[in-house]
């Protein structure tokens, strides 16, 4: 399995949807939001680690059309886009290089204007409670299968506790289904940040505060090739398709196994005092 080069699969992909239409409006949205993010970042004390590595992976994804998923802890409603203010302008304000991300329907898609604005900002609507097979998840897999960058918050909701919530199995579905479609395992890049919970505490008005200490760390790449290889022989994608077609429990077991692997690797970038997570729910027959 190849998680670094998807060029051999590009000819089998549909036309890539990398900039929402109308494109000039999408470019306007990213420019406006990018300027605001840069301004907000400048008003805080920011410490970063590994940003150059993240920029390099974003460039590779854009050039090689190699699927990439960035994951981060979720501390406030504005983690995305504010945290991207540390990226260079050539990425931050270029919608063709920017991430796709998931947005809650009850927050970002509550009226026509919000829906249009956030769609132009490459947000994909997710309905909380509709599970891992909903339309928004399918669209996210489409974007990954085109070799694009997708950013998600795998906890699935905001948490300002010191320890993480367990990662939702939808993360495993994104990785597994992208491989099943394309033969390429998405690269997973972990990001951990501290300070956003002080900028936007849940009990107060949802206005980003300034003058905070913000720390953003990009960890080592997470590879899922070995996990997926346990389900197939000689890189035969048909083996995986046959396995996943048997029943929903086997599918969820596959997705959960990938998710647990990513979860374990993600723990490595978290300060020891903040490590730990809640247990996962049991897979039912």
UniProtKB/Swiss-Prot annotation:
Pathway this chain belongs to: Phospholipid metabolism
Which is one Pfam family of this protein?
Acyltransferase
Q: Which UniProt keywords apply?
A: Acyltransferase, Lipid metabolism, Membrane, Mitochondrion, Mitochondrion inner membrane, Mitochondrion outer membrane, Transferase
EC number assigned by the record: 2.3.1.-
* Entry keyword annotation includes Acyltransferase: yes
Q: Which reaction does it catalyse?
A: a 1-acyl-sn-glycero-3-phosphate + a 1,2-diacyl-sn-glycero-3-phospho-(1'-sn-glycerol) = 1-acyl-sn-glycero-3-phospho-(1'-sn-glycerol) + a 1,2-diacyl-sn-glycero-3-phosphate; 1-hexadecanoyl-2-(9Z,12Z-octadecadienoyl)-sn-glycero-3-phospho-(1'-sn-glycerol) + 1-(9Z-octadecenoyl)-sn-glycero-3-phosphate = 1-(9Z)-octadecenoyl-2-(9Z,12Z)-octadecadienoyl-sn-glycero-3-phosphate + 1-hexadecanoyl-sn-glycero-3-phospho-(1'-sn-glycerol); 1'-[1,2-diacyl-sn-glycero-3-phospho],3'-[1-acyl-sn-glycero-3-phospho]-glycerol + a 1,2-diacyl-sn-glycero-3-phosphocholine = a cardiolipin + a 1-acyl-sn-glycero-3-phosphocholine; 1-hexadecanoyl-2-(9Z,12Z-octadecadienoyl)-sn-glycero-3-phosphocholine + 1-hexadecanoyl-sn-glycero-3-phosphocholine = 2-(9Z,12Z-octadecadienoyl)-sn-glycero-3-phosphocholine + 1,2-dihexadecanoyl-sn-glycero-3-phosphocholine
Q: What else is known?
A: The enzyme was named after a masochistic character Tafazzi, once popular on Italian television, apparently due to the difficulty encountered for its identification and characterization.
Q: Which family does it belong to?
A: Belongs to the taffazin family.
**Chain's role:** Acyltransferase required to remodel newly synthesized phospholipid cardiolipin (1',3'-bis-[1,2-diacyl-sn-glycero-3-phospho]-glycerol or CL), a key component of the mitochondrial inner membrane, with tissue specific acyl chains necessary for adequate mitochondrial function. Its role in cellular physiology is to improve mitochondrial performance.
- Under what name is this protein listed? Taffazin
């Amino acid at each position: 399995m190849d998680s670094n080069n998807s060029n051999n699969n590009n000819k089998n992909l549909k036309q890539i949807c990398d900039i929402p239409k109308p494109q000039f409006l999408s470019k306007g949205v990213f420019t406006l939001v990018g300027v605001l993010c840069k301004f907000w970042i400048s008003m805080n004390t920011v410490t970063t680690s590994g940003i150059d590595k993240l920029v390099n992976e974003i460039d590779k994804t854009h050039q090689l059309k190699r699927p990439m998923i960035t994951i981060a802890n979720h501390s406030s409603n504005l983690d995305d886009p504010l945290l991207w203010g540390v990226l260079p302008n050539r990425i931050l304000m270029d919608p063709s290089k920017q991430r796709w991300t998931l947005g809650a329907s009850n927050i970002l898609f509550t009226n026509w204007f919000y829906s249009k604005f956030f769609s132009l900002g490459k947000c994909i609507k997710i309905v909380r409670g509709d599970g891992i097979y909903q339309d928004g998840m399918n669209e996210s897999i489409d974007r990954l299968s085109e070799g694009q960058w997708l950013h998600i918050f795998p906890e699935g909701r905001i948490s300002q506790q010191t320890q993480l919530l367990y990662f939702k199995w939808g993360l495993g579905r994104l990785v597994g289904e992208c491989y099943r479609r394309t033969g390429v395992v998405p690269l997973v890049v972990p990001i951990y940040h501290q300070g956003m919970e002080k900028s936007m505490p849940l009990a107060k008005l949802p206005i980003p505060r300034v003058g905070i200490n913000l720390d953003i760390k990009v960890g080592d790449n997470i590879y899922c090739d070995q996990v997926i290889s346990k389900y197939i022989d000689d890189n035969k994608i048909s083996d995986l398709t046959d396995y996943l077609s048997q029943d929903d429990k086997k599918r969820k077991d596959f997705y959960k196994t990938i998710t647990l692997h990513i979860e374990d690797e993600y723990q490595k970038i978290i300060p020891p005092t903040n490590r730990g997570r809640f247990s996962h729910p049991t897979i039912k027959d």
